[in-house]
Amino acid sequence: CIDSSEGFSEWQKLTIEWVREHYGDTVKIGAGNVVDADGFRFLADCGADFIKVGIGGGSICITRETKGIGRGQATATIEVAKARDEYYERTGVYVPICSDGGIVHDYHMTLALAMGSDFIMLGRYFSRFDESPTNKVVINGQYMKEYWGEGSARARNWQRYDLGGDKKLSFEEGVDSYVPYAGPLKDNVAM
């Protein structure tokens, strides 16, 4: 997935073109994130196989505060789902959308699907379980799991990213936090 808080961008277009040029349709491309119909149409026309929806709605995301961009997750999902359906009517190509952000409670999944999302990003939800790669810690007598987002300084310090350019122009878009520990995944998620 070509993951960015600014998915409606020339960078995403060039990246999708590069992947298509080198790998054709053998690689499925997810792109995003976007929050409106124009962003969806742009990425769909660029050739994305699925599109992520949401800027600033994640539980540990601070993009709205640091960059001044974003939109409510429900509003974004509804508008992009409508654009997806119109795109399908016009082209015959169905481009699924992924609601990315704002899932804290179980019922939020139902809401995201009811608003038109085809599938859901569940970072915070799954970070609570034994299977997540983070440490289990005790805070004020309660077991918690560490949790941080890809836009946080902690994730960037792993040096997985070649951000290029001037480091002073880089924005931190996420924070570190904790979520209540929930035990093993198999005891909590029906399969």
Locate the predicted segments by residue.
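Glycine/Thr-rich beta-alpha phosphate-binding loop at enzyme active sites
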Residues: 1-16, 27, 32, 36-79, ...
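Alpha/beta catalytic cores of nucleotide-metabolism and tRNA/nucleoside-modifying enzymes
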Residues: 24-26, 46, 68-99, 104-191
